[in-house]
Amino acid sequence: MNFEHTDDRRMLADTLVRALRDGYPIETRNAGAYGETGYDPAVWQQLSELGIVSALFDEAAGGFGGSGFDIMVVFEALGRALVVEPFLGALMAGRALAKAGEHDETLAGIVSGETIAAFAYDDGMTPVTATESGDGWMLSGTKAVVSQAGAASVFVVTVEQDGDPLVLLVPADTAGISVRSFNVVEGGAAGDVTFENVTLGADARVGGDGQGQAIVDAAVGAGLLALSAEAVGAMEFVKEATLGYLRDRKQFGVPIGKFQALQHRMATVLLEIEQAHSAVINAASAFDGDDAKARERALAAAKYTIGRTGALVAEETIQLHGGIGMTWEYAVSHYAKRLVMIDHQLGDEDYHLQRYIALG
């Protein structure tokens, strides 16, 4: 099996890494991440114009990529720079629409970066319900911690029903929708989206009868792969930063990297990162396959591995830096927070371990 990237994919990765290295230092990232909107619209526009969102979708959806390895390459680069712009929402909402083969105008806006989309998946304390109203539906309830909910102009909303989930495309300015926005601990913004007797027409539905679960699986599967790849990119950054610190920081007249105890701890970190990277490569390979069960198992394995490894890498790299690793000004502290919080998106390591076993 050949896991080497194509020339086009290498070019995409090089372009994105270079753009982020030159134009997205940690100070720029933090200014947007901890600001009112949780991201920088100018950065989003710049990266969209480079075709980064388009790389996440195939030609049928208006993009030029869309494979599992395309998603992996893009999100590894985004994770390495700790990007907070709303790529995950674009990927998941866009994948749902593309899987259904509907709402082409909205999908085109998402792929071009002109439309900010959010995938409203996890229910809050008041689960979202949809009751039939005429030819359409009436939505009530709350979706919790929806990434970039305040900036989104459109939501793709999932509603659990007996037999098959209902998926709906809902403009953010629809009467009855309210968003309580907030910054999240690792940087970026999210919001609780409340639907109060929101009336939708029949054209709001994404997909037909019996298609709901496949649409949700397509969106969530892409999200799991993206988060796992993002974590690998973040781990690669903190690995390099920590190795540099061990070489430069001196104690008793020698670099602390000469101390065997620290060498052993760093060696463990390196091995765990390689194992996590392998799990993500396996998931990216299975993502485009015809075997749905193998794909879901590979995604569950990757997300489980990322959750376990991400926490270890965050803790160890902070410990190896000492006090400076916790400071706001030092980038590693922000990466550590993100690595811990990735585990809690779309199911944590315990959930995905149980899921992997169940799929076996």
Give the role of each language-model region.
Residues 120, 142-177:
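A short core secondary-structure module
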Residues 125-140:
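Cytochrome P450 C-terminal beta-domain/meander region
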Residues 126, 145-146, 171-208:
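Flexible, small-/acidic-enriched active-site or ligand-binding loops
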Residues 106-108, 127-129, 143-147, 156-160, ...:
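A generic local secondary-structure boundary/capping motif
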